[in-house]
Amino acid sequence: MIHKNWAELIKPTQLEVKPGNDPARQATVIAEPLERGFGLTLGNALRRILMSSLQGAAISSVQIDNVLHEFSSVAGVREDVTDIILNLKQVSLRMDVEGPKRLSVNAKGPAVVTAGDISESAGIEVLNRDHVICHLDDGADLFMELTVNTGKGYVSADKNRPEDAPIGLIPIDAIYSPVKKVAYDVQPTREGQVLDYDKLTMKIETDGSITPDDAVAFAARILQDQLSIFVNFDEPESAGRQDDDDGLEFNPLLLKKVDELELSVRSANCLKNDNIVYIGDLIQKTEAEMLRTPNFGRKSLNEIKEVLSGMGLHLGMDVEDWPPDNIEDLAKKFEDAF
């Protein structure tokens, strides 16, 4: 049965987010357990998406009074234009409106010009307001117009130059990605009695426009969306649902008691100790949940999976409205059918 290709793989059941020194920017995200090899597969894919594909905001061009090109200097400003541009690249923004938008800086010396001196605009927030842009000497004047836009990844300066760009407009390399650093590590982990699983640990740092755990969530959603085109079949209907002449809305096999299955003594005792009475109780358990049962190992798991497969069922199924209120009466009603 095709569903066994994915239904029999263990799925991560634990996702832990450990905030860093700055919770809005730094966090460690831990997911486990994963099938062996999936830690590397998912870690590498998520890292690439985090660094390249999330939407962010950045300054894409600047126009400075009395400056024609980036290799100029401004009277009374200690930094040359090239240094000012480098500093503008590091301004972190949160932008909740469609771009491009125009902002400005108007300062008089003596002064230290910071990102906090950038004019305010609805829907745009400067996050690192203490970031230094330049220093003005006494009597110096500085006026800049900044173009702010949204995008993803890295966009070079030549692509940020409009076709109708006025003289003096200097395009800037825009780094839109809100994620600054991503590192991941894969370690072995235990699930029940089995040691052969992966634990994925990701350390993430953002610019503050998005939290690390949200960044991972968005990256996972992007990956999910990109992979969906490769699924070239329709999911079979859940074996847990079945309308019949008696109005029963699930497979009557789910009313069969697990002690009627031909299981080993160890497996049967484990199910009994875990208060699993009916097959309907059993199939809603995931592999990870079963492996956490005391004295329940991979051998018992494979035995149960084989028995369920012969009935057209598998672990991890979803059965709505289970258990029914009159489960004992229903079980007796369908007892002869078993």
Curated annotation (Swiss-Prot):
EC number from the UniProt entry: 2.7.7.6
Purpose of the protein: DNA-dependent RNA polymerase catalyzes the transcription of DNA into RNA using the four ribonucleoside triphosphates as substrates.
Keyword Cell cycle: no
CDD domains named among the record's database cross-references: RNAP_alpha_NTD
Pfam families reported for this sequence: RNA_pol_A_bac (PF01000), RNA_pol_A_CTD (PF03118), RNA_pol_L (PF01193)
GO BP terms, alphabetized: DNA-templated transcription
Enzyme type, top EC level: transferase
Subunit structure: Homodimer. The RNAP catalytic core consists of 2 alpha, 1 beta, 1 beta' and 1 omega subunit. When a sigma factor is associated with the core the holoenzyme is formed, which can initiate transcription.
SMART domains: RPOLD
GO cellular component: cytoplasm; DNA-directed RNA polymerase complex
Record's comment describing the protein's domains: The N-terminal domain is essential for RNAP assembly and basal transcription, whereas the C-terminal domain is involved in interaction with transcriptional regulators and with upstream promoter elements.
A Gene Ontology molecular function term of the record: DNA binding
Similarity remark: Belongs to the RNA polymerase alpha chain family.
Descriptive protein name: DNA-directed RNA polymerase subunit alpha
Keywords: DNA-directed RNA polymerase, Nucleotidyltransferase, Transcription, Transferase
Alpha C-terminal domain (alpha-CTD): annotated segments: 250-338
Catalytic activity, reaction form: RNA(n) + a ribonucleoside 5'-triphosphate = RNA(n+1) + diphosphate
Keyword Transferase: yes
Region listing for Alpha N-terminal domain (alpha-NTD), in residue ranges: 1-234
